[in-house]
Amino acid sequence: MSIFMTQPTLNYVSCASLADPSALLHAMAYWQWGNPAAGHVIVCVHGLSRQGRDFDVLARALVAAAQSQGHQVRVVCPDVVGRGQSEWLSDPAEYQIPTYAADVQTLLARLDSEAPLSTLDWVGTSMGGLIGMAVLGSPQFKPPLPVRRLILNDMGPTLEWTALQRIGTYLGRAGDFSS
């Protein structure tokens, strides 16, 4: 049976605090496109001030391309904690790449338990690329299977200090609105 989802489903996974595993869990939202039983999973992780729905056009195109070739795929786009539909953390100090990587590791384990993963691809934009490198390059994080393709967009292995300062100036500014 062929399944082609033209709209994503919103799902949640419970994640533990990296600093204090006995603390309350937080919910990370993720948007799922395509066949939820497909073993081929493409994870798309957004940038610092973005959300999983940023990948709607790409997810729709990936599902359609797979479908046209007779394949099934599941595209999963998390809202990193504190963004989109995900919960906020109680400790602001936990908003760091290791926390995000642990959350995505929990998500991958959940996806694998729902329908075993056979192929895993990763698309990471900016911070999403850093999270991908943390998940895939750290011995403490073990995805259910090796990533076949890692696509890094708008980032590299190093960050220039001036670029971080520039990001800090616009993220730290409150917006002015007429209403």
Language-model features, listed with the residues they occupy:
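An N-terminal hydrophobic leader/cap segment in hydrolases
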Residues: 1-17, 31
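A short loop-to-beta-strand scaffold at the N-terminal edge of the catalytic core in hydrolase folds
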Residues: 12, 22-33
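N-terminal Rossmann-like NAD(P)+-binding domain of SDR-like oxidoreductases, especially those catalyzing
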Residues: 13, 46, 126
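Active-site loop/oxyanion-hole signature of alpha/beta-hydrolase fold enzymes
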Residues: 23-24, 63, 74-123, 137-143
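Conserved HGGG/HGGXW glycine-rich cap/lid loop of the alpha/beta-hydrolase fold
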Residues: 29-88
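Short amphipathic alpha-helical segments
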Residues: 55-57, 88-90, 135-136, 163-165
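Conserved hydrolase catalytic core segment
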Residues: 117-161
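Helix-rich cap/lid subdomain of alpha/beta-hydrolase
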Residues: 155-179
